[in-house]
Design a protein with these regions (language model features):
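Residue-level detector of functionally pivotal "anchor" positions at catalytic/ligand-binding pockets or at interdomain
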Residues: 468-499
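Sec-dependent N-terminal signal peptides
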Residues: 4-13
Length: 522
């Protein structure tokens, strides 16, 4: 009896061994991530640090790298005007906000970001300028008029509408786009309010390829602020690289603190169907500056309650490129007034949210099944699995080739069990578990059956990746527990993917281990 108990304890111990999870290894990789494996961070320079400057933000870029960020989108950096201090009311498109620093300071920020293999995108406001912008007096012909008077777009009293029927205005705006590439070596533009009826599709159709080709060897990316797939369909073929999955985010906002899974599945199916024939990527998020302040002035906790955790997992594993808004990693418990640059309280800690994000972003970087593509047909397939015994539980897989991820979410208000069928049985790695993630990142080997019963906490989540650990592979003839270390002298000549599976010569982008060394295939 004692011998049997000892064997049982040993077996249980072996099944719960925590192995190297590689989260920091992946996020801090010196390699630049390929398109399709990237995460974007929206930063308001004035809110991001107490100093509110480019220089102070530059000092924190290493922290963003460790979080898993690849692209820093800077909200408008131009001098503000118009009377209400909106960053989207620019006085001069070729100057920086003096409170943030100089163009040289911005360039230094970009240089440091590039050293960390991160990109910097600027917020571009093509539709209007501040009512007291320099052009109002120097080039009044750049503005649209009615009855001889300049026009406030959408009745926004702090800005004047620009006139894209004037070729001189078009040339001036394009010159501004080139200016920041020349002066600060920026990598892309997030373009505000591209659905404006005052900006013709032909403008984008001409400008985007021109700017992309402006500097030899330089890639410039364009993100358009619109749901092009559904609302701004006239812009489908003008060249934007990414749009906003607005309808999906609006659905999440309306979901709020709901506790059933059926609506989430419907949201997902609507998103996937609407994205099925697109030729550009999509950005998914649960909050940004508009949702956080303009639309509701509600924090993530106020808007979603404890749903903020599983909905984060849902949004960042379902489709597209993940966006995180500055401060979201602290739990998102501030409504940040970006008109007055409310400072983020970095002393507020939410280890559960932070470690969840770190893990999700590491998986985004390393796992092909979580990649995104501008060609809809090349995106990993999403398959919703049958769930019985708990209406609050949603389960789905994403699959690309032999790479597969399983996500299980419990949107319910009580801990419980649910039986999920349709799983590819065998070895899986549990990378993200809501019950333990607050204590730190981890990775655990487990075996799942085709029909598996899960015990999962209320508002809980788990993310599994198909495969086994190399250190638990019975065919491994070398101790390779520390394979990611460049100092490891392993002579094992086989290739292992990030989940520990032996693979043939790698063909899919990602992180591999070979002879004890990291190999990153772009």
């Amino acid at each position: 009896m004692k011998k049997s108990l000892l064997l049982l304890l040993l077996a249980l111990s072996a099944s719960t061994i925590m192995a190297a999870d590689y989260v920091d290894e992946i996020n801090n990789s010196a390699e630049k991530r390929s398109e399709g494996h990237r995460v974007i961070y929206e930063m308001n320079v004035g809110s991001f640090t107490q100093a509110g400057t480019f220089a102070a933000a530059q000092d924190s870029l290493d922290n963003l790298k460790s979080l898993g960020i690849d692209i820093v989108w800077l909200m408008p950096i131009y001098p503000r005007g118009g009377g209400i201090n909106s960053p989207y009311a620019a006085k001069n498109f070729k100057q920086t906000n003096p409170e943030y620093g100089t163009i040289a300071d911005l360039k230094s920020f970009v240089i440091r970001a590039h050293q960390l293999n991160m990109e910097v995108w600027l917020d571009w406001v093509p539709n209007h300028t501040a009512t007291d912008a320099d052009w109002v007096t120097s080039h009044p012909e750049y503005y649209a008029t009615s009855g001889g008077k300049m026009i406030h777009p959408n009745n926004y009293g702090d800005v004047w509408q620009l006139d894209y029927n004037n070729p001189d205005l078009v040339n001036a705006m394009n010159d501004c786009l080139k200016f920041w590439i020349d002066e600060a070596d920026i990598d892309g533009y997030r373009c505000d309010y591209i659905s404006s009826p005052k900006i013709p599709a032909s403008y984008w159709q001409t400008t985007i390829p021109m700017i992309k080709e402006y500097k030899s060897g330089k890639t410039i990316t364009f993100l358009g602020e619109a749901d092009i797939a559904n609302d701004a369909t006239r812009l489908k073929e003008v060249g934007f690289d990414y749009d906003y999955a607005w309808r999906f985010q609006s659905s999440l906002a309306n979901y709020g603190t709901t506790s059933t899974s059926a609506r989430l599945k419907a949201f997902a199916n609507t998103l996937l169907e609407g994205s099925s024939s697109l030729s550009f990527g999509r950005m998914l998020y649960i909050t940004n500056h508009d949702q956080n302040f303009n639309e509701s002035k509600k924090t993530l906790t106020q808007k979603y309650g404890d749903n903020r955790y599983p909905l984060t997992v849902f949004a960042y594993t379902l489709y597209g490129m993940p966006l995180i808004y500055n401060g979201q990693e602290t739990g998102g418990n501030q409504a940040l007034d970006y008109f007055h640059d409310t400072k983020i309280d970095w002393n507020t800690k939410d280890d559960k949210m932070l470690n969840t994000l770190r893990t999700l972003f590491a998986l985004k970087h390393a796992i092909p099944a979580l990649s995104d593509s501008k060609t809809a047909a090349q995106n990993p397939a999403v398959n919703f699995l049958n769930v019985s015994g708990n209406s609050g539980v949603l389960a789905y897989t994403r699959t690309l080739g032999d790479s597969q991820v399983l996500v299980v979410l419990n949107m319910g208000t009580t801990d419980g069990t649910a039986t999920v069928s349709g799983i590819d049985e065998g070895d899986w790695s549990l990378w993200l578990d809501s019950e333990t993630i607050a204590q730190g990142t981890s990775r655990k080997q487990t075996t799942l059956s085709a029909t598996q019963t899960f015990n999962i906490d209320a508002k809980g989540y788990r993310v599994y990746v198909r495969g086994s650990f190399p250190e638990q592979d019975p065919n491994t003839d070398t101790a390779i527990r520390d394979l990611p270390s460049a100092n490891n002298k392993s002579t094992d000549s086989r290739y292992y993917d990030i989940n520990g599976r032996v693979v043939d010569t790698p063909t899919m982008p990602g992180l591999y281990i070979h002879a004890g060394r990291k190999i990153i295939l772009k």
